[in-house]
Amino acid sequence: MITQSALEMRDALAEGGSLIGLDTGTKTIGVALCDREWRFATAGTTIRRTKFAADKAQIRAIVAERGVKGIVIGLPLNMDGSESPRSQGARAMARNLEDLGLPILLWDERWTTQAAERAMIEQDFSRAKRAERIDSHAAALILQGAIDALAGSAF
């Protein structure tokens, strides 16, 4: 199941469980994870993209290791809410991960990378550390927005 509705995702995850958040780019995939109660999203690793089969294998390994019950993928939208050319890449990622058998939520990722960078600057991350971790921190912001909606605190 692939959806853009937090309500549909929440229904599919009636028993809760840990979620994985993905910020997909052309060169990297930022990964974040949340707790089983959908309270806190934390930045995880960054996957350097190679071939999709290898990327998927890394995601599958994280899903299995962490007992993930659902996937949240950042959906790049234009400022007016319309889909951008990059949106198709996120949708393709969702279709390719669908055979993992987990519900997938496409979540608006507007401004997450900029917000992650500002937060990292405020925390005095060096430029090199920001470049290394920006995608996983953006994934955490995407996932946090989604779990806030899933938990009912934002619709």
Swiss-Prot record:
Q: Where in the cell is it found?
A: Cytoplasm
Keyword annotations for this protein? Cytoplasm, Hydrolase, Nuclease, Ribosome biogenesis
* Record bears the keyword Nuclease: yes
Superkingdom field: Bacteria
EC primary class: hydrolase
In its keyword annotation, does this UniProt entry include Protein transport?
no
Annotated GO MF terms: nuclease activity
Q: Which GO terms describe its cellular component?
A: cytosol
The principal location of this protein is cytoplasm
EC identifiers of the protein: 3.1.-.-
**InterPro entries (UniProt xref):** RNaseH-like_sf, YqgF, YqgF/RNaseH-like_dom, YqgF/RNaseH-like_dom_sf
Leader sequence residues: none
| Role description | Could be a nuclease involved in processing of the 5'-end of pre-16S rRNA.
Family the UniProt entry places it in: Belongs to the YqgF nuclease family.
Name recorded for this polypeptide: Putative pre-16S rRNA nuclease
